[in-house]
Amino acid sequence: MMKFKRFGHDGIHKRLQVGSSVIALSAFALLMTACSSTPSYPPQYPTDPVQPRPVEPDPRPEPQEPDLETPEENVEDYDDTEQRDGLTPPHMEGRDVKRLALLLPFSSSSERLRAEADSMMKAAELAVFERDSADVLLIALDTGGTAQGAQSAARAALNSGADVILGPILSGSVNAAKQVASSSRTPILAFSTDQRVAGDGAYLLSFPPEAEVERIVEYASDTGVDRFAFFGPTSEYGRRVNDAYRKAVRENGGEITASASYSGDDITVMQEPARSMANQYRSTRYQAIILPEGGTALRSLAPLLPYYNVDPSSVQFLGTGLWKNNAVAREPALNGGVFAGPDPDAQADFEASYDRAYGENNSRLASQAYDAVAIGAYVAEGRPRDRMERLEDPNGFYGADGLIRFEADGKPQRGLAVYQIRNGKFVVIDPAPRTVLGPS
């Protein structure tokens, strides 16, 4: 895992006291484009603060998109000039406007994606109003949840003079947006967890499972574990975790001594592989086993191991961020299990701010949209030719999800905490780093 050292950019996340404060309408500009409904503007803050409520991650994999067809029209060439004409509302005339285009699936056929987009839009709006500047223009564009829609939205973003593109969410949409944005070297801060779409100007703000696996394996190795086992699904998510797990174990000087997989999320398909894991335990005495599942599937999987005499008090159960779910924490077989996840202190601050502004829970990706605005505004302050370099600042950024810095290939390096499940609660046993050391 990367080492950390103190970073700068403290002004990026300058916060206003929200409570009963009133923020002038003229301070910021927000433009909603190609969306059936417009969020309230500006956000209204209740007088009495509301305590934040926990937000559980959605363990479902990223929805799949159809492959992008050949573009219907050629993308115009955009020059990398010092000043690009763009959309400027009348009240922002004469200012050095920083244009951030937010590409989200507002009209997706998926109700879940539409709800996610709505919460992310609110978080982005909140970030604009909390940033102490009068020169940020947020341009919201609808992708429809398709690659073709993302391509059209990215083209509209460039035509509006966007300095940075925020989004999209889905991997196919990110690839489509890259095809458009690459000619102008306009950076993209995307929300996909698929690391294969990173690079060529696209930087991922997400939490790839590979990073979580790397963190938890390093932690287990530091506690003396050197014999590891894998027990998970044959899904795309399971494959990614398995590959990352084997790599991390090898890099930390350990070995995989047992492994079993299954297809599906029903307990009946898990029973025989669980029996196999028990048999392998008797012969190899592995010290830790990773269970890359979440929700109902994990609550079905975990009890099978002690049922077949793999004792959680003797074998360390390891997980991924999918474990951070209150129902999972109540599963007795997972008591004592450990997994890696975002910095809880940073997330709590954001959740409280969002709750005060909107009186509701934020979605799973809302914090990433919030950070995207703050980072995007900082990047847009630089000359067009310097924006990639500003994004790849080795000092990184600290935001609503904790520490992040971007590698040159667009992949994120995250400062993750290690959690342990104790009597139905999540307890941080190894805090997330807040400083960056060593090369990126």
Task: Give residue spans per PLM region.
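C-terminal motif of bacterial Sec signal peptides marking the signal peptidase cleavage site
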Residues: 31-34
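Bacterial signal peptide processing site
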Residues: 36-39
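Solvent-exposed, acidic/polar segments of extracytosolic/periplasmic ligand-binding ectodomains
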Residues: 54-63, 72-87, 399-440
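Beta-alpha junction/loop-to-helix N-cap segments that form part of ligand/metal-binding clefts
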Residues: 116-119, 130, 134-196
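Periplasmic-binding protein-like
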Residues: 157-169, 188-191, 227-232, 282-297, ...
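An alpha-beta-alpha
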Residues: 204-261
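Extracellular/periplasmic periplasmic-binding protein-like sensory domains
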Residues: 284-286, 302-370, 432
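Segments of small-molecule ligand-sensing domains
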Residues: 356-428
